[in-house]
Amino acid sequence: CIANRNGCQPDGSQGNCCSGYCHKEPGWVAGYCR
Protein backbone atom coordinates (compact mmCIF):
# COMPACT_ATOMS: atom_id res chain seq x y z
CA CYS A 1 0.00 0.00 0.00
CA ILE A 2 1.03 3.64 -0.32
CA ALA A 3 2.49 5.27 2.80
CA ASN A 4 1.15 8.52 4.25
CA ARG A 5 2.29 11.70 2.45
CA ASN A 6 3.10 9.73 -0.71
CA GLY A 7 1.32 10.42 -3.98
CA CYS A 8 -1.95 8.74 -4.90
CA GLN A 9 -5.09 8.98 -6.99
CA PRO A 10 -8.52 8.77 -5.29
CA ASP A 11 -9.70 6.26 -7.93
CA GLY A 12 -6.98 3.82 -6.84
CA SER A 13 -5.23 3.81 -10.23
CA GLN A 14 -1.84 4.24 -8.54
CA GLY A 15 -2.58 1.81 -5.71
CA ASN A 16 -4.32 2.05 -2.37
CA CYS A 17 -3.28 4.16 0.60
CA CYS A 18 -2.34 2.25 3.76
CA SER A 19 -4.66 4.65 5.62
CA GLY A 20 -7.41 4.07 3.09
CA TYR A 21 -7.67 7.80 2.38
CA CYS A 22 -6.23 9.72 -0.57
CA HIS A 23 -6.58 13.49 -0.12
CA LYS A 24 -6.92 15.34 -3.42
CA GLU A 25 -8.19 18.89 -3.87
CA PRO A 26 -9.73 20.41 -7.01
CA GLY A 27 -7.07 21.40 -9.51
CA TRP A 28 -4.45 19.01 -8.16
CA VAL A 29 -2.89 16.60 -10.64
CA ALA A 30 -2.39 14.06 -7.85
CA GLY A 31 -3.35 13.68 -4.22
CA TYR A 32 -1.50 12.33 -1.21
CA CYS A 33 -2.24 9.67 1.37
CA ARG A 34 -3.04 10.77 4.89
From Swiss-Prot:
Disulphide-bonded residues: C1-C18, C8-C22, C17-C33
GO biological process, one term: killing of cells of another organism
Database matches in InterPro entries: Antimicrobial_C6_CS (IPR013006), Gurmarin/antifun_pep (IPR009101), Gurmarin/antimicrobial_peptd (IPR024206)
GO cellular component, one term: extracellular region
Pfam families for the chain: Antifungal_pept
Main localization, broad class: secreted
Keywords from the named record: Antimicrobial, Disulfide bond, Fungicide, Knottin, Secreted
Annotated localization: Secreted
Functional summary from the UniProt entry: Has antifungal activity against C.glabrata.
Comment block on domains: The presence of a 'disulfide through disulfide knot' structurally defines this protein as a knottin.
Family the UniProt entry places it in: Belongs to the AMP family.
Stated name of the protein: Antimicrobial peptide Alo-2
Lineage: Eukaryota, Metazoa, Ecdysozoa, Arthropoda, Hexapoda
